[in-house]
């Protein structure tokens, strides 16, 4: 389950159970398939050390905030029923 942010950015949730169990709910922002940032879901905060510009940060925070409940649901589902690989 991926959420398109703009033409080259999207938001995705870890698919593996172990990854979801290891950390608090978060999503990864990818640019053309490469992870460039991590965003915590509650509260919505972008992790330092990312490679996004100010406009992208604003757009990411807005998009994640608007989809936070759906992302948290998917994270919790994957925590229980995600892949074992």
Regions from the PLM with identified roles:
Residues 11, 45-48, 67:
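Generic preference for hydrophobic/aromatic residues in regular secondary structure cores
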Residues 2, 15, 19-20, 43, ...:
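Short linear motifs in intrinsically disordered/low-complexity regions
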Residues 9, 31, 37-40, 60-63, ...:
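Generic detector of bulky aromatic hydrophobic side chains
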Residues 51-85:
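Well-ordered alpha/beta subsegment
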Residues 1-12:
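Negatively charged, low-complexity tracts enriched in Asp/Glu with abundant Ser/Thr
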Residues 16-55:
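A short, structured beta-strand/loop element
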